[in-house]
A protein has these predicted regions:
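Periplasmic-binding protein-like
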Residues: 51, 55-111, 114-123
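Residue-level signal for nonpolar/aromatic packing positions in well-ordered secondary structure
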Residues: 17, 39, 44, 78, ...
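Short loop->beta-strand "edge-of-pocket" segments that line small-molecule binding or catalytic clefts
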Residues: 1-11
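Beta->alpha turn/N-cap motifs
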Residues: 9-11, 30-32, 48-55, 101
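Short helix-initiation/N-cap motifs at beta->coil->alpha
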Residues: 12, 27-38, 74
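Short helices/loops that flank or line small-molecule/ion binding pockets
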Residues: 19-20, 32-48, 52, 60-61
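Aromatic-rich, solvent-exposed beta-strand/loop patch
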Residues: 10-19
Length: 123
């Protein structure tokens, strides 16, 4: 089809596009920055990426636009074997304590993504 999409290799959206997109060529690169550079240099037609970074690009160049509906949602999770209540309890306490103690919030601030990602509320 002649359509080329820049994508950060091994990202969640790379996996999704690989499984679901059949009529375009994925151009895989080693960093998010490299994928954005390919797009800015007109070496690809489309840039796949996370919405906050795409919004940053749109603010810098009013010739860019973004589809409004995301094509996938990234939901992170942890898997354990059934019948391991002590492991489930450990993971739940670990996550809950790190949220309550502010560690997760401090990591978001450290990486300057506190306005881009959210933390679930813990009772």
């Amino acid at each position: 089809s002649g359509i080329q999409i820049a994508v950060f290799e091994r990202s969640a959206y790379d996996l999704w596009l690989t499984e679901n997109l059949k009529k375009a060529e994925l151009i895989r690169v080693n960093s998010i920055e490299e994928s954005h550079n390919l797009f800015k240099e007109n070496k690809v037609n489309i840039l796949a990426g996370l919405k906050p970074k795409l919004i940053e690009e749109m603010k810098k160049n009013n010739n860019y636009e973004m589809i409004q509906s995301p094509f996938t949602y990234i939901k992170q999770s942890i898997g354990i074997k059934k019948g391991s209540p002590e492991v489930l309890d450990f993971i739940n306490k670990f996550i809950s304590n790190n949220i309550k103690e502010g560690y997760i919030k401090s990591l978001l601030k450290q990486h300057n993504v506190q306005d881009k990602l959210s933390i679930p509320k813990i009772n």
